[in-house]
A protein has these predicted regions:
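A generic structural motif
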Residues: 84-87, 137-143, 201
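Extracytoplasmic/periplasmic ligand-capture domains
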Residues: 64, 77, 89-120, 130-132, ...
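N-terminal signal peptide c-region/cleavage motif recognized by signal peptidases
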Residues: 16-19
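Boundary of Sec targeting at the N-terminus
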Residues: 22-25
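N-terminal lobe/hinge region of extracytoplasmic solute-binding protein
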Residues: 30-80, 110, 183-189
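Bacterial N-terminal signal peptides that target proteins for export
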Residues: 1-10
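Long beta-strand-rich cores associated with HINT superfamily self-processing modules
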Residues: 502-528
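Surface-exposed binding/hinge segments that line
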Residues: 77, 123-169
């Protein structure tokens, strides 16, 4: 076995031909979010990894439909129950002219747990016990038992230069070393020039890139969080392409002959998450007094919330059609998604009865938190949820805040009810269920993103069993069963699968939208 595709075939492969007024040598991109640091190991958030892919390569590459493909590793295979062998690409150069080899892979794997931030990247190497260098282009990775999905995890294993980053591999030194450019030496298609946090990331083409030269000598990634401002910049010619066109602007943009737009399915599912602790901080009676217990620990309350959500309205009205109703935490066809899970019924009368049966006939009040600047429609979905829940008696105060505030607070377990998007970037369930639905257990390195203290011993058992199954058919069935149990518990309530729109100057570019929503300059070709 060399590499394996865990995805069912994906139908869409839309190609966008878009052209414009910018220089054929410079591409200016308007993006909703940017990196939190130039250190690729700091954050697992999508915008951070998207920016990192311009400078650094991953050991295994994730294709357009999230199929795994050779990257800096050309092939991989299990050699025994707890060892994988990876063959490394020869002739690859870092931006400083030094050779890429096995030392850099070993260094990067061992560095990640040391320097990761609160949105941890350690999940990508959680199964690694040790790394042996066999020769400059062969490594053996020893795991803590059978690890069938290790190559999938490595689509986010960014490789840094062991020499350039040697002095910048502690929490205290990492960001400064990379942000200054001293350690920002990758093998990717572009070289680091400068970065202004929350502003411009300026890149220069690396002519020695192993995939070949890109079309653009210079790339400027402008971080423009506001959707209207980003679109205005495109219309004014200040940028050549933008991501995350809002649902409000999409229909009008489609009629604009000066701008080309394309829509693609997204890997991201919006999930409502309900705190399962005995005492939760942001729930109270309608008169402001404390409740005797956390209502979200009662399954009837969680079911009531699920039945209060009108997913069709959320897609058709709130998102202007840019989405699909979701019934589980991964898109259909992904490895471990289950066809047995029904789409939840919108039934507000049933919601009210369930609340009354649980002892909350008068309802209660809760603060709902979400991001307002990360994924398309996040704030609008959050507002829609607030209205729907309030209508059945759960008075909901919506707080759509910056992702830079939201995620650290989520990691501190500050919230009682919160919503954010989760993308199954590896295309298979161990990533999503292992991160979110397993109890938070550092000993087995699962549940790192379980911020609600959800725990189901059957789910834990299934996920631990599935993680060690090399037989794909048996593993799929195990993950499907785990998904069914998680969605039945309703501590996680999936709402919609997003769809994403890009806009660009008419006739300037050719590119195919990616399922993970990444906007990557190297794969945007000049149409001229």
């Amino acid at each position: 076995m060399t590499y394996q595709n865990f995805l069912a075939p994906m139908a869409f492969a839309l190609s966008l031909t878009v052209a414009g007024a910018a220089s054929t040598q410079t591409l200016t991109m308007g993006v909703r979010g940017g990196p939190e640091s130039i250190d690729p190991h700091f954050s697992a958030l999508g915008p951070h990894a998207e920016a990192a892919k311009h400078i650094f390569d991953t050991l295994v590459w994730s294709g357009i439909d999230l199929q795994i493909e050779p990257g800096l590793a050309t092939s991989w295979k299990p050699v025994d129950d707890d060892t994988w062998e990876f063959k490394l690409r020869k002739g690859v150069k870092f931006h400083d002219g030094s050779d890429f080899n096995a030392e850099d892979v070993k260094f990067s794997i061992e560095r990640i747990p040391v320097v990761t931030g609160p949105t941890t990247t350690a999940i990508y190497v959680r199964r690694v016990a040790s790394v042996d260098i066999i020769d400059p282009h062969t490594i053996h990775i020893h795991t803590d038992g059978q690890a069938a999905t290790l190559p999938n995890d490595f689509i986010r294993l960014f490789i840094v230069s062991s020499e350039a980053a040697a002095d910048f591999s502690t929490l205290e030194t990492a960001s400064a070393g990379f942000n200054s450019g001293a350690a920002a030496i990758g093998t990717g298609p572009y070289k680091y020039v400068s970065w202004e946090p929350k502003g411009d990331l300026v890149l220069e083409r690396f002519d020695g890139y192993w995939r070949g030269m890109g079309d653009w000598e210079k790339v400027i990634r402008k971080e423009i969080p506001n959707d209207s401002s980003r679109l205005a910049a495109l219309k004014a010619g200040q940028v050549d392409v933008i991501n995350y066109v809002s649902s409000v602007d999409y229909l009008a943009l489609a009629k604009d002959t000066n701008i080309d737009s394309v829509k693609g399915d997204s890997v991201y599912i919006m999930n409502l998450q309900l705190d399962q602790r005995e005492n939760t901080p942001l729930v109270r009676a309608l008169d402001g007094s404390d409740l005797d217990e956390n209502p979200f620990r009662d399954l009837r309350v969680r079911q009531a919330i699920d039945h209060a959500i009108d997913r069709e309205t959320m897609v058709d009205i709130v998102l202007e059609g840019l989405g699909k109703p979701a019934n589980q935490m991964m898109p259909p066809g992904f490895f471990g998604s289950s066809e047995k899970i029904p789409m939840p019924e919108y039934n507000p009368a049933k919601s009210k009865k369930l609340l009354a049966d649980a002892g909350y006939s008068e309802g209660f009040e809760v603060d709902l938190y979400c991001t307002g600047d990360r994924l398309p429609g996040d704030a609008a979905i959050c507002q829609g949820l607030g209205q729907m829940l309030t209508q059945v008696g759960i008075r909901t105060n919506v707080n759509a805040i910056s992702k830079t505030v939201y995620f650290p607070a989520q990691a501190r377990l500050d919230y009682s009810m919160f919503m954010n998007g989760w993308g199954t970037l590896t295309g298979e369930a161990s990533y999503t269920l292992g991160g979110l639905a397993h109890s938070n257990n550092p000993e087995v390195k699962l549940g790192a993103y379980n911020r609600i203290e959800y725990e189901n011993s059957d789910v834990d058992r299934l996920l631990q069993t599935g993680a060690r199954m090399m037989d794909a058919t048996a593993r799929r069935a195990t993950y499907e069963e785990a998904m069914e149990k998680v969605m039945e518990d309703k501590a996680y309530i999936s709402i919609v699968q997003l769809q994403t729109v890009w806009g660009a100057k008419a006739g300037m570019l050719q590119f195919t939208p990616r399922f993970d929503e990444d906007t990557l300059a190297f794969f945007m070709k000049s149409a001229r």
